[in-house]
Structures are given as C-alpha cells and as structure tokens.
Amino acid sequence: MQGSRLIVALDTASWEQALKWVDRLPQVLWWKVGLELFTAVGPQILQALKERGKRIFLDLKLHDIPHTVGRAAQVAVGYGVDLLTVHAAGGSAMLRAAVAATQGSSCRLLAVTLLTSLGPDQVRQELGVERDPGDYVLQLARLALDQGVSGLVCSPQEVGRLRQALGPEVLLVTPGIRLGDPEAEDDQRRVCTPAAALRAGADYLVVGRPITAAADPVSAWQRFQAVEEAIG
C-alpha cells in the first residue's frame, strides 16, 4: 500500500458533509467510512470516493454468525474497498469466513481487537476480563492472525507491544490519534499523539475529529502530515 499513512475518518451521517470534506481535502488519499455514514447513505458513498480516485477503509466492524459475516464481506469486496474490519472477538469460524470472502481480491481484512473507547476499568468490570488489556489484545490479535487476516486495528497503547510480538509483516492500523493533548476529553480512552504511534510501529493512523472538526481542516491535516514526514 502506497501513499500517506493518514486515514481521515468521515464521521458524519450527511452525504453533503462527507463529500464537502473529501473535496476540501483533495490531497488526502485514504478515507474511512464507518457505520454511521454507511448506514445513513449506503454504498453510494463508496462509489463517490472511488470516482475521486480515493482509497477506502470500510470500518463496519462486522460481528455476527460466520455465514452472515462471510456474505457481508463478499458484498464489501464487490464495492472495491481496500480495507475492511471485523471483530476478532467474533471467533475463529467467523474470522475464517471473512478471510475466505476476501481471498483473491485487493481488499485486506483487519481484525479489531479492543475498542479505543474502552478503558481498563470497563474491560474488567463490564466485559469481565480480569487480565491486563494489553494481554487480552495480544490474545485476540494472535487468534485473528492465525485465521489469516492481514492486519489489526489496535489502540496506540498496544501498537508497540503488538509490533514487537508479531513482527514487521502484520499491518497495524491505529485510531485514537490526537495531535495535541492525548488526555483531552472525548469518548476515546486509549489515545496518543501521531509521533508516538508511528514510532511504536503503526502503519496507518486514523484521524477524524481533530481534522474534520477543526476550524481549518486543511491546516489541521497539514500539521498531521508534517509529523508523518518528520518521522519518515
């Protein structure tokens, strides 16, 4: 995969707003379409991005019975998306069904380990996982890779450990990126700066509101791009 390592998230339910961002930032190659936008406007947003020559990260985090996930992944492949997500917690059979659906295509399958909105207390108290979140993430990562996925979506806090444990070939995509204060209040808990994530071994960074909600999205993107270029 070539081009910038920044993926900008189209976090909106509005067709008009999504394309306004895309057209205002023509230098951005990679765009993420998540559940909100895909549910609101359907697959035509993918066609609009393809017509503009963009690469597409379809982040639907598929999590269902194996047959359903396999069929959904097959449909996504037909849209020409470049990256597609499934939940690693869906289990080995579900993961294998998704892998089988994407084989022979240019779509690379990514497994989501643990949502960046979940902090250690929630992982323990609500999910009933008494282990360190990093250990849990590594277990899910190995499960997914054993079934044949191409890479992982993981928080910046886990990316260094995963890179060290899993080697250089695994594609690591990291959301939860904040250019300024990583402790700034929002609904993501496990976040950090782009420089730290890239140095830890992330291949791609997913950035949404710090760019799209900025007073000047172009300047905000340029600041992120400058960090990427400085790291190399």
Curated annotation (Swiss-Prot):
GO process terms (BP): 'de novo' pyrimidine nucleobase biosynthetic process; 'de novo' UMP biosynthetic process
Entry-linked Pfam families: OMPdecase (PF00215)
Binding site for substrate: 11, 32, 59-68, 116, 178, 188, 208-209
Catalytic residues (UniProt): 61
Catalytic activity: orotidine 5'-phosphate + H(+) = UMP + CO2
Pathway where it operates: Pyrimidine metabolism; UMP biosynthesis via de novo pathway; UMP from orotate: step 2/2
Cellular component aspect of the GO annotation: cytosol
UniProt KW keywords: Decarboxylase, Lyase, Pyrimidine biosynthesis
GO molecular function: orotidine-5'-phosphate decarboxylase activity
CDD domains in UniProt: OMP_decarboxylase_like
EC number annotated for this UniProt entry: 4.1.1.23
Stated role: Catalyzes the decarboxylation of orotidine 5'-monophosphate (OMP) to uridine 5'-monophosphate (UMP).
Family note: Belongs to the OMP decarboxylase family. Type 1 subfamily.
Assembly mode: Homodimer.
PANTHER family tied to this protein: OROTIDINE 5'-PHOSPHATE DECARBOXYLASE (PTHR32119:SF2)
Identification of the protein by name: Orotidine 5'-phosphate decarboxylase
Organism of derivation: Synechococcus sp. (strain JA-3-3Ab) (Cyanobacteria bacterium Yellowstone A-Prime)
